[in-house]
A protein has these predicted regions:
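Ligand-recognition elements built from short beta-strands and adjacent flexible loops
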Residues: 188-191, 235-239, 243-248, 253-360
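Beta-lactam-recognizing serine transpeptidase/beta-lactamase-like catalytic domain environment
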Residues: 1-237
């Protein structure tokens, strides 16, 4: 997730950048990196949805050790989150000056790093929060014996770790993970749009000090509803029995947890069927409601769908499916677009969106 986000943020790639994946085996730095399934080449979005180690390694190497290290620490790794609990671990990322080529390559898909589950979930929450990292906390308020609130904790933004555009693109690509073609299809929940990522990591063998070929951790992290996130869930299965893959053992557990939590938290369903657009705040503009069926039909016909009224996250999610680069002006909701709705896309390579903030 974070290597791709860093490369997008640095302008090195787009969701449709094609990465040569070497048919499943690639020698780098004197070692061979493998993919579970051999791929000839993949788009950036497919590197994520198909969990290509080789694709991620090539992207990380294009960033270089110092830049990749700097961007990983920006996401909150290698230092405590400062949650309101004692004894928190900072995790461990070796200094960039100690990274060899193979270290940069493997760090790009999460190997050779030590991060806590809390750090990982908080970093994914930054994607869900439009690029803003929020300090996690456990206790929301403290009450006296009479039930009076004597202290209340408010959500605290630490800072922006990626642009809203990068966060929106990452969300759209993470949604592809939870499709029939992605590795996280077993995390799909009827009526909800889920953005997520599977993980399968080798553990260190304490006897040899090298990565074990028998001991693994399987994981799935995701947030939902993807277009208006309210819940981040991380499931880690230590030394799973049978299948070792996150998509097989952790994704179903994510689904079970989410299906139990959604009704308890009062998070409504129906997001998969409909994108409810906002009223445009521009004087004289008409409110727009774009159904997913209408958008899908426009995409099938290779015509520009109507984006007015959508948030930046929603609009970029649609455009990523078209393979269009996008220039964004302003923040908030789309009030103007070029190409216009219904226009054919033959020969069109880019799109311009103008946004304005929602009126209170």
């Amino acid at each position: 997730i974070f290597t791709l986000a860093a490369a997008l943020e640095e302008g090195l790639v787009s969701p449709n950048t094609v990465i040569k994946c070497e048919s499943g085996a690639w020698r780098v730095g004197g070692r061979v990196i493998h993919d579970v399934h051999p791929f000839d080449q993949l788009k950036l979005s497919e590197v994520l949805s198909r969990s290509s180690n080789i694709g991620a390694a090539k992207i990380g190497l294009s960033l270089g050790p110092r830049r990749l290290h700097r961007l990983l620490t920006r996401f909150g790794f290698d230092h405590p989150t400062e949650i309101d609990l004692p004894g928190e671990s900072a995790g461990l990322i070796n200094p960039a000056k100690r990274w060899q080529t193979i270290d940069t390559a493997t760090a790009s898909f999460g190997q050779g790093l030590s991060v806590t589950a809390l750090q990982f979930a908080a970093a994914v929450a930054a994607v869900a929060n439009g690029g803003v990292y929020m300090r996690p906390y456990v206790v929301s308020e403290i009450r006296d014996p009479q039930g009076r609130t004597i202290r209340r904790r408010q959500p605290q933004p630490v800072g922006r770790v990626m642009s809203a555009r990068t966060a929106a693109l990452m969300t759209a690509m993470m949604e592809e993970v939870v499709t029939a073609e992605g590795t996280g299809s077993k995390a799909a929940i009827e009526g909800y749009r889920v953005a997520g990522k599977t993980g399968t990591a080798q553990k260190l063998d304490p006897k040899t000090g090298t990565y074990s070929r028998k001991l693994y951790q399987a994981s799935f992290v995701g947030f939902l509803p993807a277009q208006r996130p309210e819940l981040v869930i991380l499931v880690v299965i230590d030394e799973p029995q049978g299948s070792i893959y996150g998509g097989q053992v952790a994704a179903p557990a994510f689904k079970t947890v989410a299906e139990g939590a959604l009704p308890l938290l009062g998070i409504p369903g129906g997001q998969r069927q409909l994108i409810q657009a906002k009223h445009s705040p521009m004087p004289g503009a008409l409110p727009v409601s774009a159904s997913r069926d209408e958008i899908d039909e426009a995409l099938r016909q290779r015509r520009m769908p109507r984006l007015e009224g959508l948030s930046l996250r929603q609009a970029l999610g649609v455009l990523s499916r078209l393979g269009l680069e996008c220039v964004v002006e302003g923040e908030g909701y789309v009030v103007d677009q070029d190409p216009k709705p219904g226009q054919g896309l033959s020969g069109v390579k880019g799109c311009r969106l103008r946004l304005t903030a929602e009126m209170s």
